[in-house]
Amino acid sequence: MEFFVENINLLLFLPLIVCAILGFNGLISNRVEKNTLFSISIAVALICLIFAGAAFDYSVFNNMSVSSNFPWLALDNINFYLGTYLDKISVSFLLGSGVLCVLLQVFAFLKLKDTPDFNRLLLYLNLFYFALNGIFISPNIFQSYLFFEIVGVAAYLLINFDFSNRDESKAAIKSFVFNRIGDLTLLFCVLTILYYAVVYNQLTDANSLSYTNMNNVSASINSLMSEPLFVFFCSILMFVIVMKFMQAFIYLTFEPKENTLLSKVILFQNAMITLAGVYLFMRLNPFFVDLGFDWVWTLLVLALMFLTLGVLNKLFIPFCKMMGWIEKYVVESVINFAELLIRAFSYICTKLQAGNFQSYLIYSLIGLVLIFAFVLIFYVLLIKV
């Protein structure tokens, strides 16, 4: 039992290894059969489930917890830590997500194994499983934020799996934007908590953002902030959690008219992000407990935030159309410019060296290098401006 708990980090590395195998198989033109790759993937998922079950028995039935931290990024007065934290909450979510991920992979194999890009689907599912495990074993809110970003990327890739489908592409873009809004808001909350922990409490060690110290951090922030400001901050925390709950509903609004098996897999995967929202709510519960009867004001602020988001959403669609037109114009202009340069250099080589293949290739490469240099210079100047 202790072996599984001491090596619980394998819950992160094993799905990543499967992703590497699937990615390498794509580089060698999918020479490995789908059945073999699925066998590897489901075996790893079952091994991870065994680790999660052992951790569940260790923390729930034996009433024990495990915590480890190591410095990852050190600044002048701020240190960021990564590590592992297992308690009753984390192991419960690990076990639940492990069971659901195994069922999802089995369903995808039974129903979608004849899909030409099934290996890519399997890669995205393992990437999502890796990120979900990372959220649940994180010892602090900063590490959870990092894995929330990976969850957002995996969700975008899965929704946009059939990128030739315009409905799926629209759903992927909207899901990605909503994820970025939620994750950037979470980053704001992380930096706010870190500011109060470091500046006012002089916490520069692993306790500054640790879940084990969240009660003290919440009480300290509540005492330092004014009452309206604390209500607003808790409203932002609740906004982040609600955005995670809305992930499945966002996909439902853009779900394709044909209810395919792939859309069911994607919907089930998006619904699993709700687990991450529940987990975040339980970890940040000390802030909501300290609100007391100010919950009414929190709900009012939350409603105003979503009203603002709805207005921005109405403006977002025309903005996307405009940016799509600009992007198309820029891409076509660059392609035409590149073609013009290559033709010019090929003409020069025919005049100077009789147009043999080697000279044509050399001058074409020179033209491409000049194009890349032009784009790079333009990009640098644009940043400076």
Segments predicted by a language model, with ranges:
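Central hydrophobic cores of alpha-helical transmembrane segments in multi-pass inner-membrane proteins
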Residues: L10-I28, S41-A54, S97-L110, F128-Y129, ...
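Internal transmembrane alpha-helices of multipass membrane proteins
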Residues: V66-F163, G182-L184, P256-T260, K264, ...
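Alpha-helical transmembrane segments and their helix-start/interface "positive-inside/aromatic belt" motifs
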Residues: E33-I47, I173-T185, S359-L365
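Aromatic-capped, Gly/Pro-kinked transmembrane alpha-helices
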Residues: N77, Q269, V311-V385
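Membrane-entry segments of alpha-helical transmembrane domains in multi-pass membrane proteins
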Residues: M1-F13, K34-S39, N79-G96, G134-F147, ...
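Alpha-helical multi-pass transmembrane bundles of energy-transducing inner-membrane proteins
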Residues: V32, Y124-I221, L309-G310, K314
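Transmembrane helix-loop-helix hairpins at membrane boundaries of multipass inner-membrane proteins
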Residues: M1-L10, A20, F24-L123, A197-L224, ...
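Juxtamembrane/interfacial segments at transmembrane-helix boundaries in multi-pass membrane proteins
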Residues: F56-G83, I150, S164, E168, ...
